[in-house]
Amino acid sequence: MQTYTYHIVNVFADNHFGGNPLAVFPNADDLTDQQMQAIAQQFNLSETVFLFAPTAKHGVQAVADLRIFTPNYEMPLAGHPTLGAAFVIQQLQNLLNNFVLNTIAKPVEVQVNDSHIELSLTGFEQRISVATHEELAKITGLMADDIANQAYWMNTGTSQLLLNVLSKQKLYDAKINKEQLQTICQKDNELAMLYLWYQDHDDVFVRFFSIENNQVVQD
């Protein structure tokens, strides 16, 4: 039986058992799509990342290609899995502080400074959601006066429904209605992913929700 090494990385953590856990397989070239999906389902973490030898896709010289799986489906791009994968490959290969990873969606530039990692990418698509003001309020469990009049789909590699909440407290008070979120996302022909945000001067506070195994989860 073939064996594979994997690493568990706690992204956005301030202690060993905090943050957002992620499984990273640094040598996944021999795994099939079905095997990767089954492994991600077995780990049952929000995402599992598989690293491959770099290809010439996107026309950029990368140190590795990566693929990201939730327990239910593959994602073309996601932030915290790419951060965790960047940390693992930088440690394993003793890379310089600047390198590129190729995701399914696009190349991602990585900058490493001690234990801090920054990602940068270019290009996005934006469009207005069909959801009415009242429908958006029902998604969040808030009053219509607590949220912006419209929500936008933003795609930098993965589409997410962005909705501005008008106070920090209301951002934390939001309770997501799964059925309403699914209904709106189906109307927009998108996966159920909601990004709530509130800005206070230079600080932006966010909560991100998706649906996994028929349940609302917060990432």
Language model: regions and residue ranges:
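Acidic/His- and Gly-rich active-site-bordering loop/insert found
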Residues: 22, 29-36, 41-63, 68, ...
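A short glycine/serine-rich beta->alpha loop
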Residues: 12, 68-76, 210-219
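N-terminal, positively charged, Ser/Thr/Ala/Gly-biased leader segments
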Residues: 1-18, 142
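Short beta-strand-to-turn element immediately C-terminal to the catalytic PLP-Schiff-base lysine
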Residues: 24-27, 51-52, 162-166, 197, ...
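Acidic, low-complexity central loop/insert segments
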Residues: 38, 60-65, 69-185
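Conserved phosphate-donor
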Residues: 44-65, 180-217
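Short, conserved active-site loops that position catalytic residues or coordinate cofactors/metal ions
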Residues: 18-24, 80
